[in-house]
């Protein structure tokens, strides 16, 4: 009964999704357009979160895409997609998962669309990023944190 009451008190809502920062660079254009297109795509991603008020959090998903063609940078695109979320009455582990995996999963399609649009506006072939398993990334992060804590010498 107590679990049911606690579950009813938990709440989650999206307050706002916004573009926080964007950058597109094509340092080797227009000569890049004259080469055969055989891209090497590198994706880096990162998430950050901070509390804005009681139960209100900002989560920022940063995606950096670097595409090289014949060892030269064709373009570099960076997007910081932000969101403001209400996440109330959650246990610490639930909140960490919500901010570290669930919210980035919501933000990713927006960031992916922005990157795709920027790439097309740069007149490069369309880039469709594959979905990201943020749950798996979050679990890997928790495992690495646990291993670091286990390996750290304890103070006696």
From Swiss-Prot:
This protein's encoding gene: secB
Gene Ontology, cellular component aspect: cytoplasm
One Pfam entry name: SecB
GO biological process: protein folding; protein tetramerization; protein transport
HAMAP family, alphabetized: SecB
Protein name: Protein-export protein SecB
Lineage, highest ranks first: Bacteria, Pseudomonadati, Pseudomonadota, Gammaproteobacteria, Vibrionales
GO molecular function: unfolded protein binding
Main function: One of the proteins required for the normal export of preproteins out of the cell cytoplasm. It is a molecular chaperone that binds to a subset of precursor proteins, maintaining them in a translocation-competent state. It also specifically binds to its receptor SecA.
Source species, domain of life: Bacteria
Record's keyword terms, sorted: Chaperone, Cytoplasm, Protein transport, Translocation, Transport
């Amino acid at each position: 009964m107590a679990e049911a009451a606690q579950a009813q008190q938990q709440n989650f809502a999206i307050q706002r999704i916004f573009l926080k920062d964007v950058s597109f660079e094509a340092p080797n254009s227009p000569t890049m357009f004259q080469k055969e297109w055989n891209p090497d795509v590198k994706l880096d991603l990162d998430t950050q979160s901070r509390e804005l008020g009681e139960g209100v959090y900002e989560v920022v998903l940063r995606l950096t895409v670097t595409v090289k063609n014949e060892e030269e940078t064709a373009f570099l695109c960076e997007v910081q997609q932000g969101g403001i979320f209400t996440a109330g009455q959650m246990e610490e582990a639930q909140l960490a998962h919500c901010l570290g995996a669930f919210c980035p999963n919501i933000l990713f399609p927006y960031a992916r669309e922005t990157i795709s649009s920027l790439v097309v506006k740069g007149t490069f072939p369309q880039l469709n990023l594959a979905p990201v398993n943020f749950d798996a990334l979050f679990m890997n992060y928790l495992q690495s944190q646990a291993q670091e804590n286990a390996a750290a010498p304890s103070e006696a």
